C-alpha cells in the first residue's frame, strides 16, 4: 500500500482527469467531477480508489472489487461490477502508471533524501565544475573538475560525478551512484549504487601473466534511459559503450566494454552482456540471460529468462534455452526429453 510517509500524496484526481491521462472513455452518464483519492490493487481497493485490470488471471478479483473506478481493456469491460466505473482503454496498465505519477510524483524517480533545494554545504563541488541553475546536490555528493550538470537534475546523497562527466537536464542520480568517463543525456534516471564508466575487463592473457589493457573509451547514455540499482556499465576499451534512448535496465545488470544497446530496449535483472555485443532497437532480454561477446541481437528480438546466447539472433526472433534457439524448437526439445525421461524412469526413480 502507498504510505504518505514515503510517498506524499498530491491530492485527489477527478475521473475526468483520470480518463484524459489514461486515454480512456468515461461511461455515459458518469459524473466526471467525481474524484479518486488513491490507487490500489483490485482485491484491496476501496470506494475512493482507482484500480486497473488487463490480465485474465485477475478476472475473479475484478468481479469482487470495491474500487470507485477501474481502468480496463475492452475485453474485460463487461466484467466490471456495478458500483465501479469502467474506464475503458486499450492500455490499462500504462494509463494506471500515468495516474500514479500524478498522485505520487515523488515515486516516479529518486529525489533528494533531504527534500532540499540547491547545493548542500555538506557536498564537495570542484570550483571548475559547472552546474546550471536548479541543480539539487545532497550532502556527501562529490563532483569533479570539469563536470557539467544540467538544470533540474538531482544528485542524491553520496553520488559521485567524475572529472569531465556531463549529465543533462532533468536527471535523477540515486544515492551512492557513481558516474565516471560518461556523457549522459536528459531525463535519465540512475538508481542507487549503480556504477557507470569504470574499467572494462580487458587483459592480454599469456603464460607470463595477464597484462591489463587500458580502457580509454567512454559511456554514452542517451535521453530517457533508466538504470537500476547496483547495475554496472563499463566504459569502452577503445570505442564507446552506448545505451540508446528510452532503454530501461533493471537492477544488478552487467554491461561490458564496447557494448552498444539500441533504443527502447528492456533488460531485466541479473543479465550479463559480454564485450562488443550489439543489441539493436526494441530488444528484450529476460532475467538472468547471458550473452557471449561480439554478437548482434536483431531489432525486436525477445530472449526468454535464464537463456544463454552464443550466436547472432535475427531481428524479431523469440529465442530461449541453453544454448538459446528459436522458442518453438526449444519447446519441442524439452517435450521430447520429458517423454524420453518418463519412458526410461524405473520404479526406483521416486525422488520428486
Curated annotation (Swiss-Prot):
Keywords: Acyltransferase, Lipid A biosynthesis, Lipid biosynthesis, Lipid metabolism, Repeat, Transferase. It catalyses: a UDP-3-O-[(3R)-3-hydroxyacyl]-alpha-D-glucosamine + a (3R)-hydroxyacyl-[ACP] = a UDP-2-N,3-O-bis[(3R)-3-hydroxyacyl]-alpha-D-glucosamine + holo-[ACP] + H(+). One of its GO terms (molecular function) is N-acyltransferase activity. It comes from the Bacteria. HAMAP family: LpxD. Belongs to the transferase hexapeptide repeat family. LpxD subfamily. This is UDP-3-O-acylglucosamine N-acyltransferase. It comes from Methylobacterium sp. (strain 4-46). The gene is lpxD.
